[in-house]
Swiss-Prot record:
Keywords: Methyltransferase, S-adenosyl-L-methionine, Transferase, tRNA processing. Its EC number is 2.1.1.-, 2.1.1.35. InterPro entries: MeTrfase_TrmA_AS, MeTrfase_TrmA_CS, SAM-dependent_MTases_sf, TrmA_MeTrfase, U5_MeTrfase_fam. This is tRNA/tmRNA (uracil-C(5))-methyltransferase. GO terms for biological process: tRNA methylation. It holds the Pfam family tRNA_U5-meth_tr. It catalyses: uridine(54) in tRNA + S-adenosyl-L-methionine = 5-methyluridine(54) in tRNA + S-adenosyl-L-homocysteine + H(+); uridine(341) in tmRNA + S-adenosyl-L-methionine = 5-methyluridine(341) in tmRNA + S-adenosyl-L-homocysteine + H(+). S-adenosyl-L-methionine binds at Q189, Y217, N222, E238, D298. The keyword S-adenosyl-L-methionine applies. The keyword Lyase does not apply. It comes from the Bacteria.
Length: 366
C-alpha cells in the first residue's frame, strides 16, 4: 500500500523510457520490433487497497510513501477506476458516524469491474458478530445507488459474506465479449484495458490451429477462454482451488465446451505427463489424449523452473507472458538452444512504476 504522487502529464515520457528499457532488454535476441501497448494515464486500476486511519472522530484512507514511509491521506486515487473513486467518498462518509462498522477497522479493499459492479472488503482487528452484519447489510443497501456492490467482512480466521463473494466482468477482445467471474481475494488482472490488449496480442500470435493448446498458470481462465476458439481443444492447469473453480464456471458461463481445467501445479503436470508421477486428476483429464503444439505460460515473478522449462521446450510455439523481465530473459536464454524469439511486446500494466509486463513468442528452430 505504497503510493507516489503522480502527474499524468509525465506519462508519455515515462512510457517512452520504459519502452526503451524493454527494447534494450530484448536486443540480445535480435528482434527488430517490440510492440508497446499504452495504458490510460488515469483511472486504469480496477482494484485498490487502503489502510484506514482513525484520528478522533475523523476516519480516512491512507497509503505510505515508499521511501519515507510517511502517511499519505487518500481522498482520491487517480490510478483507481472512476467507480473506486466514487465508492471511496461515499463509503467513508457512511463509515464515519457508524460506531459498529468503524470500530477496529484497519483496511478497505476495492475490486471493481468495467460493468459497474464492485466488492468492498472491510478488514478488522476484532471478531465480527451479528450486529456487524446487520449494519453491513444497511451499508450495502446505501451503496446500491452508486453500483451493484457486495460487502465482505474479514477478521482473523473469519470471513462474513453478506450475499456473494464474486462479481462478473465483461472482457472485450477483438469485438467479442467474454464474461469473467472474479472472486474476492483471488488474482485478477488489475488494468482492464491492458488486459484486453494482452489477450488480443496472444490470440493474434496463436493463430488458428487444428491442434491443441496447453496453458500453465491459467488462473480464472483469463487467456484460456478467448484463446479456445483458436484451437481444437485447450488443456489448462492451475494450482489455486478458487481459481480453478472460477475458470470452470467461466467456461460454462461463456458456453465454451473445448476447455479442460486441471488443478495441478506446473511441476506436477510435467511429472504426470512424463510418467514420473501417477495422478488421478491427470488421468481423469486424459492429459495424454491432447495434441498440444502450442503452450501459453503466465508464471509468477519467479519465472519457469528447470522442470517446467524442460516441458515447454518440447512445444513448437511458446507464448510467454511475464511480470518479471529478469526471470523472463533468463528463461529465454535457457530456451535459446531450441527456440528463437519471433515477437515481443510491452504492456504498461502498471504506469508510473518500474514494473514491466511483457509478452514474447518463441518458435522452435528448424
Amino acid at each position: 500500500m505504497t503510493y507516489k504522487r503522480i502527474d499524468t502529464s509525465e506519462y508519455p515520457q515515462q512510457l517512452a523510457q520504459k519502452a526503451d528499457r524493454v527494447r534494450e532488454m530484448f536486443r540480445p535476441f535480435h528482434l527488430n520490433e517490440v510492440e508497446v501497448f499504452e495504458s490510460p494515464a488515469s483511472h486504469y486500476r480496477m482494484r485498490a487497497e487502503f489502510r484506514v486511519w482513525h484520528e478522533g472522530d475523523d476516519l480516512y484512507y491512507i497509503m505510505f510513501n515508499p521511501e519515507t514511509r510517511e502517511k499519505i491521506r487518500m481522498n482520491e486515487f487517480i490510478p483507481g477506476s472512476l467507480l473506486i473513486n466514487e465508492l471511496m467518498k461515499e463509503l467513508i462518509s457512511l463509515l464515519k458516524p457508524n460506531d459498529v462498522l468503524r470500530r477496529k477497522l484497519f483496511q478497505v479493499d476495492f475490486l471493481t469491474t468495467t460493468t459497474g459492479e464492485a466488492i468492498i472488503s472491510l478488514l478488522y482487528h476484532r471478531p465480527l458478530d451479528d450486529q456487524w452484519e446487520q449494519e453491513a447489510i444497511q451499508l450495502r443497501e446505501a451503496l446500491t445507488s452508486i453500483a451493484k456492490v457486495e460487502v465482505i467482512g474479514r477478521a482473523r480466521k473469519q470471513k462474513r459474506v453478506l450475499y456473494k463473494e464474486s462479481v462478473t466482468e465483461e472482457v472485450k477482445v477483438d469485438g467479442k465479449s467474454y464474461l469473467s467471474l472474479q472472486t474476492e481475494n483471488s488474482f485478477t488482472q488489475p488494468n482492464a484495458i491492458i488486459n484486453q490488449q494482452m489477450i488480443s496480442w496472444a490470440k493474434r500470435h496463436a493463430g488458428n490451429n487444428s491442434h491443441d493448446l496447453l496453458e500453465l498458470y491459467c488462473g480464472n481462465g483469463n487467456f484460456t477462454l478467448p484463446l479456445a476458439e483458436n484451437f481444437n481443444r485447450v488443456l489448462a492447469t492451475e494450482i489455486s482451488k478458487s481459481s480453478v473453480a472460477a475458470a470452470r464456471e467461466n467456461a460454462e458461463l461463456n458456453n465454451i465446451k473445448n476447455v479442460t481445467v486441471v488443478r495441478m501445479s506446473a511441476e506436477e503436470f510435467s511429472a504426470a505427463l512424463s510418467g514420473e508421477l501417477e495422478s488421478k486428476r491427470a488421468a481423469d483429464a486424459e492429459i495424454h489424449s491432447f495434441d498440444c503444439q502450442t503452450v501459453l505460460v503466465d508464471p509468477p515473478r519467479a519465472g519457469l523452473d528447470k522442470d517446467t522449462l524442460k516441458l515447454v521446450s518440447q512445444y513448437q510455439r511458446i507464448i510467454y507472458i511475464s511480470c518479471n523481465p529478469e526471470t523472463l530473459t533468463e528463461n529465454i536464454h535457457d530456451l535459446s538452444s531450441s527456440h528463437k524469439v519471433t515477437a515481443a511486446a510491452m504492456f504498461d500494466q502498471f504506469p508510473y512504476t518500474d514494473h514491466i509486463e511483457t509478452g514474447v513468442v518463441l518458435e522452435r528452430k528448424s
